[in-house]
């Protein structure tokens, strides 16, 4: 199981993308013949006084101040003029599903795009629930944009298949290119990265985050410009290959604007010391291995604490791969200013952890392995009163492992960190009382993801289902937009979600529910639902049909190892032609040929994709 520890923030999916499918006839025109006579006269009079191009110029200047996707979406729906001007003034586009529209539709609608955020595979791909060759290819997007957007400056991809050729075309096509962010992507190697480093002379951001990067034995670090660079952020902690440290040291020295640097595990603590002395301006640091060289180059060990002390601007700290505990005190000098700390790769004990966290009074974001135990979480609760986001990952993700964190840690956090807004908590045991306490103590929660790793586990004290705990979360946390549920849950828990989860946009369900009625409660009761992820739950055809009135308004529905039939999926595909219904991995040669192993449904403006592999059947 792959944990998504890519960024110290939640996905920015709470705002809708602008409508790309609206023809001009679908938008109300205040000058149309359907308007009332008075409105028509007023509109004609106004157009005579102020020509259309004057009004559009004024509107163009106004819309430039709208940054929110949601606001721009609303503006584009006012009338044809607003729709047209909004498209002309939009420089940033977010596409939450690369198959929701074609690249051609994007370039036809928006002519001046400088920044693109594009997402591919659904999130359950992170848990090995999707075959690796499913799709989400970047190739058609970069080839289309190469012709349409010569001024493109930023590409941010997540769960996309990106090849070295794609990166080469990107580097050749956009002379002013500045930012490349690849999160959980695959298909490319150090050869492609070297081309970007060499040809994108204005590059400010190169962030490779949780991506699978092939080692082509290319010295990509040496491919950056030999003179002063524009680099502001360089993250390559996911690159599982040695790097040319001398070239890296020179690159850091030539990058006076560098604020973020995240190193891979092949950079030792001694080398980190040298980098810090040459880059005191850093604000975000990923430390690399945090262990010394196997063969020290000198008898006297460097003063690591002094190097950290020189970096007075560091507020975000991560890394700590291959951690050697005796060196951990070196970070003491920066702890007081930290707002973000990521120990999610460090197997650190409570005794090692507590001296660190007790100095982090400004911390707002904290990620860690469950090796810090309940004792460590109690120290967090006692110290970090400004905490907004907490993520606790399992050191041992097996279902039958002994989890070192429990309801005790969760209860402590809820009592000590009253400003908490987002939590992801992996554990082996939990109680309703602890979850209810969190709902009462942390009413500002927008994200609550509780992952009880053992299947169908009840409240381990009372033996009852976890219904009341999750019910309290949706009832008391009025701002909740994202919810992940687990443990022993009956239909009652889902009834609570449908009754109180009016703002929930993303719901993840694993091993939960009694019957189809559970899913029906959610589909009929959660009007804002956009993303629905379900695995190993007893929901079947009746449940799926109950949401047909909702699917056009949702980004996607994912259901795996449930009780769906291919016949039901075909019926939905026939009834909803603008909904793409993919059946993944079903075997037609056995007795269960009508059984659907995995269903992935999503809305699309351009119909089914043309690159589906053989194991995908589009109904």
From Swiss-Prot:
GO biological process, one term: protein ubiquitination
Compartments, record wording: Nucleus
Keywords, ordered alphabetically: Auxin signaling pathway, Nucleus, Ubl conjugation pathway
Protein's pathway: Protein modification; protein ubiquitination
Region of interest (Interaction with auxin-responsive proteins), ranges: 126-127, 394-399, 451-455, 510-511
Pfam families cross-referenced by the UniProt entry: F-box_5, Transp_inhibit
Residues binding 1D-myo-inositol hexakisphosphate: 119, 158-159, 391, 447-449, 482, 530-531, 555
GO (cellular component) term, any one: SCF ubiquitin ligase complex
Residue ranges of domain F-box in the record: 54-97
Domain of life of the organism encoding this protein: Eukaryota
Span list, region Disordered: 1-43
Keyword Nucleus included in the entry's annotation: yes
Keyword RNA-binding: no
Site (Interaction with auxin-responsive proteins): 210, 426, 535
Primary subcellular site in the record, as a coarse category: nucleus
Bias-annotated ranges (Low complexity): 16-43
GO molecular function: auxin binding; inositol hexakisphosphate binding
Further details from the record: The myo-inositol hexakisphosphate acts as a structural cofactor.
Record comment regarding domains: The F-box is necessary for the interaction with SKP1.
Assembly and oligomerization: Part of a SCF (SKP1-cullin-F-box) protein ligase complex. May interact with auxin and auxin-responsive proteins.
UniProt protein name: Transport inhibitor response 1-like protein
């Amino acid at each position: 199981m792959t944990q998504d520890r890519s960024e110290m923030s939640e996905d920015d999916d709470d705002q809708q993308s602008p409508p790309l499918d609206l023809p001009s006839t679908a938008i109300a025109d205040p000058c149309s013949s359907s308007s009332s006579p008075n409105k028509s006269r007023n509109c004609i009079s106004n157009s005579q006084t102020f020509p259309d191009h004057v009004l559009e110029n004024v509107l163009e200047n106004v819309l430039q101040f709208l940054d929110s996707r949601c606001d721009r979406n609303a503006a584009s729906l006012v009338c044809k003029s607003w729709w047209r001007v909004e498209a002309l003034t939009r420089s940033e586009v977010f596409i939450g599903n690369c198959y929701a529209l074609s690249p051609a539709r994007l370039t036809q609608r928006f002519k001046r795009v400088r920044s693109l955020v594009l997402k591919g595979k659904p999130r359950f791909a992170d848990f090995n629930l999707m075959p690796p060759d499913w799709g989400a290819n970047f190739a058609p997007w970069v080839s289309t944009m190469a012709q349409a957007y010569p001024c493109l400056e930023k590409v941010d991809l997540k769960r996309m298949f990106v090849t070295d050729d794609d990166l080469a075309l990107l580097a050749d096509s956009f002379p002013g290119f500045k930012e490349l962010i690849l999160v959980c992507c695959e298909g490319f190697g150090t050869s492609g990265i070297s081309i970007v480093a060499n040809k994108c002379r204005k590059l400010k951001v190169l962030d490779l985050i949780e991506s699978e990067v092939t080692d082509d034995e290319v010295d990509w670090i040496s491919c950056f410009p030999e003179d002063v660079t524009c680099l502001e952020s360089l993250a390559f902690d996911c690159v599982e290959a040695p790097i040319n440290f001398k070239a890296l040291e020179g690159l850091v020295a030539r990058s006076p604007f560098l604020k973020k640097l995240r190193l891979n595990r092949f950079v030792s603590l001694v080398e980190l010391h040298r980098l810090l002395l040459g880059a005191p301006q850093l604000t975000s640091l990923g430390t690399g291995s945090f262990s010394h060289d196997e063969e020290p180059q000198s008898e006297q060990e460097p003063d690591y604490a002094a190097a950290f002390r020189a970096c007075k601007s560091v507020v975000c700290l991560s890394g700590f791969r291959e951690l050697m505990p005796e060196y951990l005190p070196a970070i003491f000098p920066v702890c007081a200013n930290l707002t973000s700390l990521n120990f999610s790769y460090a197997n650190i004990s409570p005794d090692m952890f507590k001296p660190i966290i007790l100095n982090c009074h400004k911390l707002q974001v904290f990620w860690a392995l469950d090796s810090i135990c309940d004792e460590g979480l109690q120290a967090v609760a006692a110290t970090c009163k400004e905490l907004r986001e907490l993520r606790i990952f399992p050191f041992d993700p097996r279902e039958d492992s002994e989890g070192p964190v429990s309801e005790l840690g969760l209860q402590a956090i809820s009592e000590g960190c009253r400003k908490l807004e987002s939590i992801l908590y992996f554990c082996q045991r939990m109680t309703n009382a602890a979850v209810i306490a969190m709902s009462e103590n942390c009413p500002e929660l927008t994200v609550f993801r509780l992952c009880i790793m053992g299947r169908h586990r009840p409240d381990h004290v009372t033996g009852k289902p976890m219904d009341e705990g999750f019910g309290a979360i949706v009832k008391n946390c009025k701002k909740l937009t994202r919810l992940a549920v687990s443990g022993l849950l009956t239909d009652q828990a889902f009834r609570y979600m449908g009754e109180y989860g009016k703002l929930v946009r993303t719901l993840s369900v694993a091993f939960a529910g009694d019957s189809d009625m559970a899913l029906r409660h959610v589909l009929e009761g959660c009007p804002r639902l956009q993303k629905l992820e379900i695995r190993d739950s007893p929901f079947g055809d009746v449940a799926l049909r109950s949401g047909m009135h909702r699917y056009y308004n949702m980004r996607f529905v994912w259901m795996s190892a449930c009780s769906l039939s291919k016949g039901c999926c075909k019926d939905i595909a026939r009834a909803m032609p603008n909904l793409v219904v993919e059946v993944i991995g079903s075997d037609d040669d056995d007795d269960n040929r009508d059984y659907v192993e995995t269903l992935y449904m999503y809305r699309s403006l351009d119909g089914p994709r043309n690159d589906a592999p053989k194991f995908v059947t589009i109904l």
